[in-house]
Amino acid sequence: EQIASRPPQLSEAIPVTLDEKQQVHIPIEQVKDGKLHRFVWIADDGKAVRFFVINRQPDKLSLAAVFDACLLCGDQGYVMEGNQVVCVGCGVHMFIPSIGKPGGCNPVPIEDWQQTETEILINRASLEEGLNLFSTIVEIDVKDPISGTQMKNTKTEHKYNYEGKTYFFESEKNLDLFRDNPEKYLGKGE
């Protein structure tokens, strides 16, 4: 009886990375079976953005790519129970063909993803739209662009956002040097 009262556990999220064109590639063969396929992209500040792909129709290909979060319940995510997709936050059962449409407890849609003959392509800008939906920060190795010092993103409070990328610094002095003249240091410490 204790098992039934525990909240459903999310299936493991498969890590994805961006290619040189700033896109994630997901093979259709991997996600067309009607089950929920969860992925995670780690932004350069360590924020984990979860999303899933599901085929909405049993007899034909009708894929949806959505963030693993909703506007009502936040980033608790969704689970597959039998052939139902359920919001972990409130327990509502999704009408699977409606996944990909905005509103209610539906997962937040990912904008501007593309489908080719063989794969799904999601660009960085589309994934970044989901940054504010999630709160999990993953510890990653970062490098101070001034000194070249390696550190963990979670172990320094000195960070600065420049042209959509987060940079980390071992000291306030280094942050100030960078902020005053970022072009001088970019390309050197990356």
Where are these regions (language model features)?
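N-terminal pre-ligand scaffold of iron-sulfur
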Residues: 2-78, 100, 109-167, 177-190
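Extracellular secreted precursors and ectodomains with disulfide-bonded cysteine-rich loops/domains
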Residues: 68, 85-88, 103
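Iron-sulfur (Fe-S) cluster-binding segments and ferredoxin-like electron-carrier domains
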Residues: 77-82, 92-100
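Cysteine-rich micro-motifs
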Residues: 84-91, 165-174
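Short amphipathic alpha-helical patches
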Residues: 91-97, 113-114, 171
